[in-house]
Amino acid sequence: LKAQPDGEMKDGFVEVLVKTNGAYEGLSLDMSVLDAAGNTVALDGQYANEDHRTMLRAIVAGADLWSSEHPTLYTLVLTLKNNGAPIEYISTKFGFRKVEILDGVIRINDRRVVFKGTNRHEFDCRTGRYITEEVMRDDLEKMKRANMNAVRTSHYPNCPRWMELCDEYGIYVIDENNMESHGTNRSTIIGCPQIPDSRPEWEKACMDRIQALYERDKNCTCVVCWSMGNESLGGETPKKMYRYLKNVDDTRFVHFECHGDPEEQSLSDVQSKMYAKPQECEEYALTRRDGRPYLLCEYTHAMGNSCGSTDEYTTLWDKYPCLQGGFVWDWVDQSILTKDDQGREYLAYGGDFGDEPNDGHFCGNGLLFGDRRITPKYYEIQKLYQYVDFCAVDPVRGQVEIKNKYLFTDLADFELYWCQCSDKGVFRDGVVEVQLAPGEKVLDLELGRPCNTEFYLNLELRTKEKTLWCPAGFAVAKEQFVIDAFANTYDELVADAPLLVDDTYGSLRGMSDDVNIRFERRERNQLVSIKVGGEELLQGPMRFNFWRALTDNDRGTRAGSRLGCWRDAGDTPGIYNNTKWSIENYKILDGGKKVVVVSGATVCTQPECKGQVIYTITSKGMEVDMQFFPNDALPEIPEVGLLFELPPDFENLTYLGAGPEENYIDRCNATQIGLYNTTVTDLYTDYLKPQECGNRTGVRYATLVGQKKVFSLVAEPVMELNVSHWLPKEIENTWHGKDLPPVTKTVVRCIARQQGVGGYDSWGAHCNEKYKNKTDKTYRLKFQIRF
């Protein structure tokens, strides 16, 4: 079955080659093409041929074309007749679409396409390799809602029903053959060279597989590309597979990741790379063009807390026509839902069943958890894959440029919801029609302007009608513009009553009727107690923190050893790396209404670093002004900030900052500044192997509420905030979330800067240099604690 539009993309041409068995005399074939409403739109009929191969042809005038945006399907009905009497019926659904590579660019229906894709293993934590249709549909709905348009069936043909559903939902499929021989070129076993290469004993098996794939899926409209396999390198056998596909199918291109094979142009129609850095992609676009389009068949390795810097790739796809997208590795964690000896359900991975050898939790690379809950990484991909960009022309006056990146869709099916809001809520909003053909336009919104406050212009492009994959009112694109940033977040602390200062018995205290602040003066020389209304707030001293629970990407860079000097550097005095504090001086100001305590610190790395914290205390609160002066002979710092512990009942959190999902300096495109209400329990992200999670950037202020007490923080101007029930080292040393220690505290990390999470790969790639905490600079963190 071949169904393609004409050169003007108006009429659809369908050709069907039918093979019959047995005697041909008296046999005839009728073909009907039905539209989605069941109307017959084309007919043809032929007598069967002596060679048992009968060609039927028809034209559908004004055909609706199939694409990921508009997956219009027609129904083909074939009737086999014997002397005019029907004896057999066959039907299938299909769409009209054209795939070609023209001038080094992949085009679908005459438009340059960007594959916004993911790799997907067929795996379910409850049923293993068997996937129900319900799960398939759930996957497709989540993919479409994430603005994805493509899937690579890594690394084998998927269930036929999946292919039918991709036709239905509109997903471009890179249909991958089951050939995987990763690593055989590096074998240390004598007599076990690379396979299949040019070895004749493998040729028949490989050819059989590629032929079976083609024959099974040749009529699937969603299949726009054949992939010959995964990481199997070159040789004569792959070349024969490539030539076979080119001979039998001129309607699709062929993909093969050849790993730099010198003859790769005889193996693949596209330049395919895995985990190339953004600069490598751009270098190809600028200097290494070999005439082929460039695809990232795997990129942004989504293992654990990852997917940082993905925006560096998507920006390039918009800039260079030959860079045509990529496929996230991968869609869902391949973990198994099981129970431990205590009957607790958990998602298990390699080694949990006593299996040896195993690959540990390296199966946890998904945008979804194994039980198909959405991870925070998903929302970053959703934002970066969206088809509409909003650019600020003059957001204060409500002038915004909208760029429509859909290929076949104007924006008449959507409406634009906009609102002006601040931390006090929405004060002006509206809905406007946006009827844009693919292109650009500037909108003028009727905005008001609040006085002397930071506010936000939030935009959402929403569907007007329910679709197969989303409800009416679903936001397919979002943007936020921050106006008058930081105008309302920091006021000087009120000092309405004098403090009594007591510097005796090994403690320095600042006290009022309701507040008692105590610094220990014997050994620790740290802030160790904040009592308000007789209630103790601190469960441990306020101290430097330079560590985060290692992420999977951190482990890949050997950060545990490479950056290990920072692991314990912020701890209170001990026998290993720690910080030694001293109270250098204190001053009583404003007639006793203010007490300023200057605390110095020597961080016992090798070589040492210096730090300082200035505490300005009043009866209504305390300002904390931290500076850290690292030694540039030391490696980068995972995190720079202060850590303290509150009682465990401090569970409810309200904050003004980036949200609603966890975010990091290199993974924050999907966030919006807003006032969010959450809990400390919900801030924890249950990655397959516990690791750094729950961070929030751009925090202006935050309030933690306990059973009887309130603890408020106000940043100057912003900080990062991480609140958890566990210390970083407790999280890092746990293999499953179910085994974390019982909750006995609430750990607050006020952070000047945490490093990016990275994501180029998980076996050695660092985060982008600009997201590292270098040691050739000074770090400062300033915030208030309000009583």
Question: Where are the language model's segments positioned?
Answer:
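Surface beta-strand/loop "capping" patches
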Residues: 1-23, 375-413, 492-512, 626
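An acidic-aromatic loop/edge-strand motif
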Residues: 1-16, 20-27, 90-98, 369, ...
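Beta-strand-rich binding/interaction modules
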Residues: 11-47, 76, 399-431, 443-446, ...
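Extended acidic/polar, glycine-enriched regions
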Residues: 17-101, 455-499
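Beta-strand/loop-rich accessory regions of lumenal/periplasmic or secreted enzymes
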Residues: 67, 447-452, 463, 467, ...
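Extended substrate-binding grooves/exosites of carbohydrate-active enzymes
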Residues: 85-401, 406-412, 417-425
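Catalytic cores of secreted or luminal carbohydrate-active enzymes
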Residues: 343-401, 405-423, 441, 448-491, ...
